[in-house]
Amino acid sequence: MGNYNRKVNEMFDNSIVLNNGVKIPQLGLGTWFIDDDKAADAVKAAVEIGYRHIDTAQAYGNERGVGEGVRTCGIPRDKLFVVSKVAAEHKTYEEAMAGINETLEKMELDYLDMMIIHSPQPWVKVNQCEDRYVEGNRAAWKALEDAYKAGKLKAIGISNFLIEDIASLLETAKIKPMVNQILLHISNTPMELVEYCQKNNIVVEAYSPIAHGEILNQPEITTIAKKYGVTVPQLCIRYTLQLGAISLPKTGNPEHMKSNAELDFEISAEDMELLKNFKKIKSYGDSGIFPVYGGKM
């Protein structure tokens, strides 16, 4: 048991240094789909297991609960890395700044370790229009920069931004984004985007590293996981870590939280190439309606 705990704890000790010198734990807990009234218990369970990086968003509707969990988990605030996201619809400076302040009030926290723009387009426009909201993203980014300078945020970043979106933002940004949180998993590995971010010293974060569960239905992936003596979710999470990304598996189940951190193995270079080029899954099942999975609102 002691050896097991040591190996899991080692995983939680792994961190990446952002371009402003701030350290971010490489494995975090995603909280999408965790109800607000269950979020505090989920955060406390995760922290007890060893997680120190908690990721939420205005769109998740659980910031209050996540904040409660952070405040009552028994771990000093400065030992946790807490992230939220500016709503995708906030495309003016005023909306974004009001949202940042509202998040801090809702979570009852003095600062966030990071806040990011959730999407370059409002969700109702994703996969439906060509407009990349260049000026709106620049305005929202200015709000993040100002909140960062004021000490409300320790780091700032973006999510779901494509190369063209990042390039447009960099033209006027005073502060470079520290992360780009994207859909990244076996069967969806946009290497051009990943390499562009890495070249620009922007850390990639992987949300839905287990493809919202749909990767569990791929027999070839199950075979590779068995070869390493691990579960498919463990293989998927390890894959994103070996790409140099931060991994954010989402779950409210403490057993899954534990299992997701048992990553004391290494995928061979040969298998990494195979997984990078694995065929695209045809569907995200019932979750395919969400814009991040190609759906339309």
Could you tell me what each predicted segment is?
Residues N19, G67-R77, L104-E108, L170-A173, ...:
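Acidic (Asp/Glu)-rich catalytic clusters
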Residues D35-A46, T92-M107, E164-I166, N188-T189:
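Short, acidic/polar
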Residues A96-I116, D146-A150:
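CE4/NodB-like, metal-dependent polysaccharide N-deacetylase domain
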Residues L27-D37, V86-Y93, Q128-E130:
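Active-site mouth loops of central-metabolism enzymes
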Residues H53, Y111-M114, A155, V179:
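Residues at the N-termini of beta-strands
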Residues R77-H90, Y111-P120, L184:
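A short, structured active-site edge motif that brings together acidic residues
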Residues A88, P122-M297:
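Beta/alpha (TIM)-barrel catalytic core signal, keyed to glycine-rich beta->alpha loops juxtaposed to Asp/Glu
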Residues G2-L80, A211, Y284, P291, ...:
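N-terminal binding-site loop/beta-alpha segment at the start of enzyme catalytic domains
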